[in-house]
């Protein structure tokens, strides 16, 4: 199959003309629709990118806000713990001071009671010794004793004193 140069040029002109006609028809009837679709698609992509950027920024803001709140909560918890420790230390100091004061009062009261009991015991013993001395002196005077009888009488009264 031989193709001549004239046929080739004719085919070339026909194909080129058909292509130009196709471009003109596309430009007249479909080009605005095609470019509209591409523009809508480009706008949608740009809008999606903008929304994604806004969402990322909001997420960063929320993350920072949560981080700040967490730091604030930690600081507040630390303050509460420190206040509780201070309150506990103050309570401990107050309780110890009250206990020492109460112990001092109890010790002082016990010492006073001991001193009072000692004074009462001494007065009682002095009274009994005085009574015994008077009684013994009366018996000695009423009885004229020799030294041996005198010693026996004193021993007898000492034994009675020990039993009382």
From Swiss-Prot:
Bilayer-crossing regions: 6-26
UniProt-annotated location(s): Cell membrane
Keyword Ion transport: yes
Membrane-related topology note: Single-pass membrane protein
Subcellular location, principal: membrane
GO molecular function, one term: proton-transporting ATP synthase activity, rotational mechanism
GO CC annotations on file: plasma membrane; proton-transporting ATP synthase complex
Transmembrane is among the record's keywords: yes
Induction per the UniProt record: Induced by a decrease in external pH from 7.5 to 5.7.
Job description of the protein: F(1)F(0) ATP synthase produces ATP from ADP in the presence of a proton or sodium gradient. F-type ATPases consist of two structural domains, F(1) containing the extramembraneous catalytic core and F(0) containing the membrane proton channel, linked together by a central stalk and a peripheral stalk. During catalysis, ATP synthesis in the catalytic domain of F(1) is coupled via a rotary mechanism of the central stalk subunits to proton translocation. Component of the F(0) channel, it forms part of the peripheral stalk, linking F(1) to F(0).
Quaternary structure and interacting proteins, as annotated: F-type ATPases have 2 components, F(1) - the catalytic core - and F(0) - the membrane proton channel. F(1) has five subunits: alpha(3), beta(3), gamma(1), delta(1), epsilon(1). F(0) has three main subunits: a(1), b(2) and c(10-14). The alpha and beta chains form an alternating ring which encloses part of the gamma chain. F(1) is attached to F(0) by a central stalk formed by the gamma and epsilon chains, while a peripheral stalk is formed by the delta and b chains.
NCBIfam families reported for this sequence: ATP_synt_b (TIGR01144)
Family per similarity comment: Belongs to the ATPase B chain family.
Protein known as: ATP synthase subunit b
Species, as recorded: Streptococcus pneumoniae (strain ATCC BAA-255 / R6)
Phylogenetic classification of the source organism: Bacteria, Bacillati, Bacillota, Bacilli, Lactobacillales
